């Protein structure tokens, strides 16, 4: 922070802030500033009304700023474009959560056993094996997005970089809902033990008989997860169409331009649903 400035570091270097602000574009609330106090510290743009910039919001007078409701996902097209590497970051978020879910399945356990039997070195370096496999999945997701961004960018008369910057935010709904869906099971199950953790914070067995108490069926949890993923996919496709319409006045032309991206979104969504449908590992 001392070297680059507080806001620059938070926007580009502090991981948790970057993740939180990325997912905030999907939120139903937005910060807005009617009359900015000066140039944006985060270099998010110089629009007359600035949306989604905490630095500009804090710097503005109280009468010139506010918080308002908005439709879920509308921040994808209302807020400024993502910074350098923003597209790769969003795709990496999605890929790492999908991979984390895959590592808990029986198929991953079978794959791991198959590899370890044939390459003993990986068996002795299990963490390195998992890291390399995760990087491979992330690279595959990013390469697929880069290829599609190139196609879409050329169809719009621009470059692959332009396509990536414009359409990367449209993947945030898919990444966001899969993130929530992935950890929803932990919330439902482990959340039932919150009272026991509060009553026994040091693990002294003061609450030895803590057990699940909600009785929520696993099928209900699974269907909620599926519904979340499908909902996020629908919002992502809708927002991609709105982004396409910003440069294509003809509705049909906008559909043609975004078609490769929609196919990629279907592939990303299918990968999440496929992982969700796998049998969990007994380990």
Describe the predicted segments one by one:
Residues 1-66, 99, 229, 271:
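Transmembrane-helix bundle segments that line or gate the permeation/cavity pathway
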Residues 1-12, 27, 76-88, 121-138, ...:
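Membrane-entry segments of alpha-helical transmembrane domains in multi-pass membrane proteins
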Residues 13-16, 76-93, 162-176, 252-265:
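Alpha-helical transmembrane segments and their helix-start/interface "positive-inside/aromatic belt" motifs
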Residues 31, 43-93, 215-225:
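Loop-to-transmembrane boundary segments
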Residues 95, 99-190:
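Long, well-ordered mid-to-C-terminal structural blocks that present hydrophobic/aromatic surfaces
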Residues 106-122, 193-214, 282-283:
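Membrane-interfacial helical/loop segments at transmembrane boundaries in membrane proteins
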Residues 169-244, 249, 256, 263:
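Hydrophobic alpha-helical transmembrane segments and adjacent short intramembrane/lumenal linkers
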Residues 270-283:
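Juxtamembrane boundary at the C-terminal end of a transmembrane helix
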């Amino acid at each position: 922070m001392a070297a680059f400035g507080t806001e620059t570091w938070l926007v580009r270097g502090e991981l948790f802030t970057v993740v939180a602000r990325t997912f905030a574009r999907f939120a139903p609330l937005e910060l807005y500033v009617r009359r900015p106090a000066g140039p944006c510290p985060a270099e998010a743009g110089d629009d007359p009304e600035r949306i989604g910039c905490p630095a500009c919001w804090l710097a503005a007078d109280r009468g010139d700023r506010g918080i308002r409701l908005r439709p879920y996902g509308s921040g994808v097209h209302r807020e400024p474009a993502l910074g350098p590497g923003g597209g790769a970051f969003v795709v990496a978020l999605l890929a790492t959560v999908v991979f984390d879910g895959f590592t808990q399945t029986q198929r991953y356990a079978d794959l791991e056993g198959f590899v370890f039997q044939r390459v003993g070195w990986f068996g002795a370096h299990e963490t390195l094996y998992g890291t390399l496999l995760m990087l491979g999945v992330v690279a595959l997701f990013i390469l697929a997005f880069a290829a599609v961004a190139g196609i879409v960018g050329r169809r719009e008369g621009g470059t692959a970089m332009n396509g990536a910057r414009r359409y990367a935010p449209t993947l945030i709904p898919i990444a966001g809902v899969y993130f929530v869906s992935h950890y929803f099971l932990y919330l439902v199950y482990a959340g039932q033990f919150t009272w026991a953790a509060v009553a026994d914070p040091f693990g002294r067995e003061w609450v030895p008989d803590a057990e699940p108490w909600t009785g929520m069926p696993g099928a209900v949890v699974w269907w909620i997860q599926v519904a979340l993923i499908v909902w996020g996919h629908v919002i992502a496709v809708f927002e991609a169409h709105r982004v396409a319409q910003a440069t294509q006045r003809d509705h049909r032309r906008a559909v043609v331009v975004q078609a490769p991206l929609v196919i990629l979104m279907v592939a990303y969504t299918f990968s999440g649903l496929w992982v969700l449908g796998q049998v969990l590992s007994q380990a």
